[in-house]
Amino acid sequence: MKQFAFPKYERLLKRSEFVQFTNARQRIHTAHFILLWTHTEDSTLKIGITVSRKVGNSVIRNRVKRLVREFYRLNKSRFVMAHYNIIAKKGAEQLDFQRLSRELANVLERLHK
């Protein structure tokens, strides 16, 4: 069961950690998400989730973040060791978990090509 955990050391929490993505050239766009990633020298896997107010009110934004966290938790082994920031675009609030999972799984497949 611990393999499906999402401990604090796997999260991007500080502003300075998110700022490293400002000039990230490594990005993939989909209809509802933007995935930014940077390889780091410490070879750790960390993820940050960004949902702006354009997506909806706080209840909706938190739901989108919960769904993305759940996708990460269940598919952690498919991520390469790097730091990721998943940004939700307007319209992501309309996705259910299956459609969100399909879209993010396609992103990971494109990432590994």
UniProtKB/Swiss-Prot annotation:
Its EC number is 3.1.26.5. The keyword Thylakoid does not apply. One of its GO terms (cellular component) is ribonuclease P complex. InterPro entries: Ribosomal_Su5_D2-typ_SF (IPR020568), Ribsml_uS5_D2-typ_fold_subgr (IPR014721), RNase_P (IPR000100). GO terms for biological process: tRNA 5'-leader removal. SUPFAM superfamilies: Ribosomal protein S5 domain 2-like (SSF54211). Keywords: Endonuclease, Hydrolase, Nuclease, RNA-binding, tRNA processing. The keyword Disulfide bond does not apply. One of its GO terms (molecular function) is tRNA binding. It is an enzyme of class 3 (hydrolase). It comes from the Bacteria. It catalyses: Endonucleolytic cleavage of RNA, removing 5'-extranucleotides from tRNA precursor. NCBIfam families: rnpA (TIGR00188). RNaseP catalyzes the removal of the 5'-leader sequence from pre-tRNA to produce the mature 5'-terminus. It can also cleave other RNA substrates such as 4.5S RNA. The protein component plays an auxiliary but essential role in vivo by binding to the 5'-leader sequence and broadening the substrate specificity of the ribozyme. Consists of a catalytic RNA component (M1 or rnpB) and a protein subunit. Belongs to the RnpA family. HAMAP family: RNase_P (MF_00227). This is Ribonuclease P protein component.
